[in-house]
Amino acid sequence: MDTKRMLQNSVLALTDDTLISIGTVTNAAREVANDGVDQCDPQIITQASSLSKLPLEPSSVDIVIPIFRSIEFPGDLLVKEMFRVLKPGGTILIYSSQQSVIGETDKAISGLQRKLLLGGFLEAEALQPKPVGLSNVVCSFGVKAKKPSWNIGSSFALKKSIKSPVKVQNDDYSDLIDEDSLLTEEDLKKPQLPPVGDCEVGSTRKACKNCTCGRAEEEEKVKLGPTMDQLSNPQSACGSCGLGDAFRCGTCPYKGLPPFKLGEKVSLSENFLVADI
């Protein structure tokens, strides 16, 4: 809504006196804007100090202009009513039509500002004294304030600032290196298992009939028992082989043979080397 239309349709003037001129109201309204003041058709309520409730709908006017003589006007109840009828963002202009001593004026202005702030208004500020009305009545002081641009009970979401987590500088591991970088290509190659022999695998491994891995030759070398050369020319590294089994070690090739003299040929029966089974 523009200022001209606002001044024409939604101005309310209050006074504790029995009479007030329209010129007084229009001159006071010039504090808000000059455009459209001459076409202003305000609503005027006299002897407003006796009212406990204003006969207006809530949020129905844009400007409220109380002009008073008594230092006690407007009361707290009337301030509450003026706040109710003002639209969000509306303006209130309070004028005194009596001259006062400078010290009393400052005290009255401070009291009015405090009363308006407690009543819910914002930006309460003192106005410079100037003539008000057709009779050039001097306005000893005045106070201007605004109603908040939001309605009572309205709510809106607040944008919460997102705090990023604090980054901790940790240099304890700055000297460490990646272990994987120490590996070469040879280290990464999969090891090749040795080829499996053609002999059977089990808890008791032995050479097969057609052994080609050399196991048969190894088994022949470790077979216990005297060879033909040992029987023809018996020798002993320990010197006890010819004394009998009581003096022979566990791996003695002559174990099981009767006592003999070293260097003499040992005679065995024909079935000595034949297996019992």
UniProtKB/Swiss-Prot annotation:
The lineage of its organism: Eukaryota, Viridiplantae, Streptophyta, Embryophyta, Tracheophyta. [4Fe-4S] cluster binds at residues 238, 241, 249, 252. It comes from Populus trichocarpa. Residues 238-252 are annotated as: Fe-S binding site B. This is Anamorsin homolog. The keyword Iron applies. Component of the cytosolic iron-sulfur (Fe-S) protein assembly (CIA) machinery. Required for the maturation of extramitochondrial Fe-S proteins. Part of an electron transfer chain functioning in an early step of cytosolic Fe-S biogenesis, facilitating the de novo assembly of a [4Fe-4S] cluster on the cytosolic Fe-S scaffold complex. Electrons are transferred from NADPH via a FAD- and FMN-containing diflavin oxidoreductase. Monomer. Residues 161-188 are annotated as: Linker. Residues 1-160 are annotated as: N-terminal SAM-like domain. It holds the Pfam family CIAPIN1. One of its GO terms (biological process) is iron-sulfur cluster assembly. Its main location: cytoplasm. [2Fe-2S] cluster binds at residues 199, 208, 211, 213. The C-terminal domain binds 2 Fe-S clusters but is otherwise mostly in an intrinsically disordered conformation.
